[in-house]
Swiss-Prot record:
This is Ammonium transporter Rh type C. It comes from Gallus gallus. The keyword DNA-binding does not apply. It is a multi-pass membrane protein. The lineage of its organism: Eukaryota, Metazoa, Chordata, Craniata, Vertebrata. Pfam families: Ammonium_transp. Residues 1-20, 91-94, 154-159, 210-227, 281-293, 337-351, 426-467 are cytoplasmic. Belongs to the ammonium transporter (TC 2.A.49) family. Rh subfamily. GO terms for molecular function: ammonium channel activity; ankyrin binding; carbon dioxide transmembrane transporter activity; identical protein binding.
């Protein structure tokens, strides 16, 4: 006999037709669009041998694959393992955290290859893709994973897929405006990935505000083993963040510099986070929420300026500041956002991605405005900011102004896009869980028998107590 489901469930969360239909329809659409538009780039095409002769290359080692693929591997692990496991801290939402992150990322990278391809690598009616396109698609999906953190445990998989469709589209537009029209530098995505993703997600979760979410408060916390799983995600993200911030930088000194700056900022951020986590607790004990999240803020904040001459000590300062800002945000700001602004931020993305992303954009603007030929050298100065062609007359101060404008554009795109998507997801047709069933795997997943029994008894205490 099938076990009775949770009492009090007032919403239809039945996914048997909704989820398969949208997944299959969208995958068929991807197959058709890829068939029409997508082709291998020159360095992935079988005509590479002719390309080598034309470019006077003697070895396959000059193929961009061998420069970019190690970084791509690291970024790929961050998206699917790092972000996925970071969100497993919820005691009863481990399947949803990893599984839905897997789902939206797998769909998102396909749509991102198309959207970014139409903007950046569309030639003669075809999108030409190579390993750098794969990295950029992962970056785009990283922004979606950030937004997912704000609504974790409160949405259906169908809502997540719809959000991914819109967010990837808006990300590609925002990225094109910043990188191509404003000509800003944002190698590690402080503005395009973190600022946009965080404030997009926060706007969406504001529209999806649940006044009775207190009914699920008992499941919103963590247990010992769920925090350990989340810490696995933290460590993967922390270790690979230098690759993330340097993955698409120019070969040579820029990529080298980006990795060093990120490395230093992350290290400083850990010590500051530990210090303030202890300082802000009455008994001086460390809070695992801070260690899992705030320790990564240094990587976020150094993203825009990573390939600039920020210097190692400058990176340490950025990491130091972000450790403080992020930890203080978790302690004081997150409760205020929920009680005063009705922003229910499950993972605290405002503290890990939002504020550090803004700091990163500001640091990038200041570093660009302060750049001189004495520091960079004449050729290095031109190369670092790509002051060529129509931008050859641009000065550091003007570049700094455009960098600051990039922050504003990202925020406007995030708020406008989040408002649109939040309004769509608010419609009562997507199978989202009832307030009392949020943060619960059992709504959308088959869970092991003993776990399911625990959930049933938790919602039916009278029967649990009966002999």
């Amino acid at each position: 006999m099938e076990r009775p489901r949770h009492q009090g469930m007032t919403k239809n969360t039945y996914m048997r037709w909704r989820l398969p239909l949208i997944c299959l329809l969208w995958e068929v659409a991807m197959i058709i669009l890829f068939g029409v538009f997508v082709h291998f780039g020159p360095e992935a095409d079988a005509h590479w041998e002719e390309e080598k002769r034309e470019m006077n290359l003697t070895s396959d080692i000059e193929n961009d694959f061998y420069f970019r693929y190690p970084s791509f591997q690291d970024v790929h692990v961050m998206i699917f393992v790092g972000f996925g496991f970071l969100m497993t801290f919820l005691k009863r939402y481990g399947f949803g955290a990893v599984g839905f992150n897997f789902l939206l990322a797998a769909f998102g990278i396909q749509w991102a290859l198309l959207m970014q391809g139409w903007f950046h690598s569309f030639q003669n009616g075809k999108i030409l893709i190579g390993v750098e396109n794969l990295i950029n698609a992962d970056f785009c999906v990283g922004s979606v994973c950030v937004a997912f953190g704000a609504i974790l445990g409160k949405t259906s998989p169908v809502q997540l897929l719809i959000m991914t469709l819109f967010q990837v589209t808006l990300f590609a537009v925002n990225e094109y405006i910043l990188l191509n029209l404003l000509h800003v530098k944002d190698a590690g995505g402080s503005m395009t990935i973190h600022t946009f993703g965080a404030y997009f997600g926060l706007t969406v979760t504001r529209f999806l505000y649940r006044p009775n979410l207190e009914q699920s408060k008992d499941k919103e916390g963590s247990v010992y083993h769920s925090d350990l799983f989340a810490m696995i995600g933290t460590l993967y993200l922390w270790m690979y963040w230098p690759s993330f911030n340097s993955a698409i930088s120019e070969h040579g000194d820029a990529q080298h510099r980006a990795a060093i700056n990120t490395y230093c900022s992350l290290a400083a951020c850990v010590l500051t986070t530990m210090a303030f986590s202890s300082m802000l607790q009455k008994k001086g004990k460390l809070d695992m929420v801070h260690i899992q999240n705030a320790t990564l803020a240094g990587g976020v904040a150094v993203g825009t300026s990573a390939e600039m001459m920020l210097t190692p000590y400058g990176s340490l300062i950025v990491g130091f500041i972000c450790g403080i800002v992020s930890t203080v945000g978790y302690v004081y700001l997150t409760p205020i956002l929920e009680s005063k602004l009705h922003i229910q931020d499950t993972c605290g993305i405002h503290n890990l991605h939002g504020m550090p992303g803004l700091i990163g954009g500001i640091v990038g603007a200041i570093t660009a405005a302060a750049a001189t030929e004495d520091v960079y050298g004449k050729e290095g100065f031109i190369k670092a900011f790509d002051f060529t062609g129509s931008y050859k007359t641009r000065t550091p101060s003007i570049q700094g102004g455009f960098q600051a404008a990039g922050i504003v554009v990202s925020l406007l795109m995030a708020f406008a896009g989040g408002t649109l998507v939040g309004a769509i997801l608010k419609l009562p047709i997507w199978g989202d869980p009832a307030d009392e069933n949020c943060f619960e795997d059992d709504i959308y997943w088959e869970v092991p028998e003993d776990e399911e029994s625990d959930v049933y008894h938790m919602h039916n205490p009278d029967k649990a107590a009966s002999p």
